[in-house]
Amino acid sequence: MLYNNKSFIFFILTSLLLSSHLLHFISAYASQHEDHETPFSYSEGTGKGPKSWGNINPNWRACGNGKMQSPIDLVGKSLLVSATLGKLKRDYNPASAVLQKGHFISVKWKGDAGQININGTYYKLVQCHWHTPSEHTFNGSRYELELHMVHISSDNKKAVIGIVYEYGHPDPFLSRLFPYIKSLGGKEKEIRNVNPGDVKFGSRKYYRYIGSLSTPPCTEGVIWTIVNKVRTVSREQVRALKEKVEDGFVENARPTQQLEGRATWFYSP
């Protein structure tokens, strides 16, 4: 009986510890995005468009004067081809989440949705969201949609995985979320289980560079990984994402930023 009691106490303490770590990751991400309460726009004609973001809020100065900003144009002739960057190691779990709308439609995980491992550092998955059209361009060309999967390490460093889409067959991950997106009335909707493992990469090849968050406060030092495979999404799915964006900016892609001498890699194992 004593063994069972100790086991129970150990289970409770372990659960509390894991919960506190998860809350740390979520609150760290939220603290970087709390300034979204300050209005900004994707339309330059409003005076609050992307070119003016750095002047709207003192905490957003990097949006205007940063030297490692995102997104960028990935130009084939400028890429450094590498076979040693390493496989992107994913370990995702289904977890409870909240579907939210604002400047974009997003899924914010409340439970432990798993992590990725980049160069020996673990980054917890906290959120994903969509931009229309794609934010990153490829030799100057944009795609119809881009998904960003946002991860945070224990020391508050960020890593984002980007996946671009062209029109074609429906995307399986969006198909599972589609009923919730279509019925999203208020600012958010609880979803019992969302499995980030349903997001398909389709290729081990990827682009890599150091950039920033692509929305205010445009925090720099973000590790960007853009999957090489172009996935497909249906027109109906993209239309649903655009219709539910709260502020009416159906095109919510920041213009590409200057490279400022940064290296861009292409991992080809």
Q: What name fits each language-model region?
A:
Residues 2-269:
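Alpha-carbonic anhydrase
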